[in-house]
């Protein structure tokens, strides 16, 4: 069955298609993923606990919890190489706000950065204030180059650690870290599909919609304030809505009749690309988000959908079956210069353009008829398969630093959200609740 047939077949067939075609892949492309990239050796001396626990039951020491989150964030940054502090002779409880003589031994053992801190709770209830002081020693300068106090309630302890990690990344790369980013996704609730949001590491999942409809294919606005998504209010109408995260307010952006699907906002937020069958065939359209003027971008006998913007905003990748089976194509933002990108394999769909611009992830069907994630350069000269193993891998979305991809997979039976580095390493499952979690989309950096 062709992609066009599936799209035109209607509601039931299309819902089945959504879980298959919204996919992608990944590979090495950024400084931290290059074979010659040297991670910065970093030792976390510890977060000294000055009193209090993260939970009112007293089970988790505050300092230990912050240290655990910080270590995970630093590891996932792919900027630093964590060095075991055992044997280095440095302990957070013995450190002040100045370089310590014990750092000399650490530096002799290859450490470039030492991080430590202190944390305590002012009073005994769970809503009391937490003070966390974080320090950074840089061996190159032989000085403490960072010292900062973080203050908040016990409910934001993880956020404090995330912020500290992001500031470390920014200090040493000049780029925002990803520890405070969010991932929106779709979760099955009975016969409905509702939108959820969670921290990038899977913590603190929160439901965004609760209307009992099918709410699918969310995508972020560049300012992180909104999500655009397709909503199925009935069997014959699929609209594109805008959801304001801070207030929960919703607006309908596209209601042209027929299928209105796979929305994607441009990097500057000025345009919305989407697919619509309002004129009979699934074609790509572009809406000016200010004037609401709509321009049709494609006209052909095949079905066109799943647009993904290049970071420049000048091009889009999309899926089309105009050549037979689903393949990835490129098109200029004004509808000109359409060309086919993928030629290997009979099924390539759901492209996701990396924020660095030099890779496009997509779903590829292997010779063994497995749906996996692949990467291809925009010039088509290099292609790699990222994922292997059991299950259907689907719905890729890039981290804002371009070092990771989040996607859904049925590797464990049910569909859940996973994260993987762009070199294919460190595969991690990050959702553990819900019966079916899919269509993840990674927020821009804060």
Give the location of each predicted region.
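Short loop/turn segments that connect beta-strands within beta-propeller blades
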Residues: 140, 199-203, 244-248, 288-292, ...
